[in-house]
């Protein structure tokens, strides 16, 4: 069974790019264009991993991350953002993100980050 990944990004172009990359890596993909929809889709679709944009209309990505982790402490989340400041990375690490993907997306980096996060999630489930 292919791992399901939820892409959360208010940019249709970013969602399409990530979908194309993930589908070449043999992942099943579901999408949400904002934070509130992401929370709904997460609990309806039960994805194995969430790729989450930080800067979105309505609900900031960090707030979505915190809410996801409150509702499901085992939620696996990788942040996708153009903001590469170390303070931003520390904030998302502290909130429980398992990785960080820079925009614009590079296929190999996306697939490596997804694979690493899924492996880390599998390791934490067995401990």
Give each language-model segment a name:
Residues 45-51:
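Active-site beta3 strand of CheY-like receiver
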Residues 63, 84-101, 112:
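Alpha4 helix (beta4-alpha4-beta5 surface) of REC/receiver domains from two-component response regulators
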Residues 57-58, 85:
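The feature encodes the CheY-like receiver
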Residues 12-30, 95, 117:
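Two-component/phosphorelay signaling modules centered on CheY-like receiver
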Residues 106:
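Receiver (REC) domain switch/active-site region of two-component response regulators
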Residues 34-37, 60-63:
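Acidic catalytic/metal-coordinating carboxylates
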Residues 43-45, 67-74, 95:
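Conserved phosphotransfer cores of two-component systems
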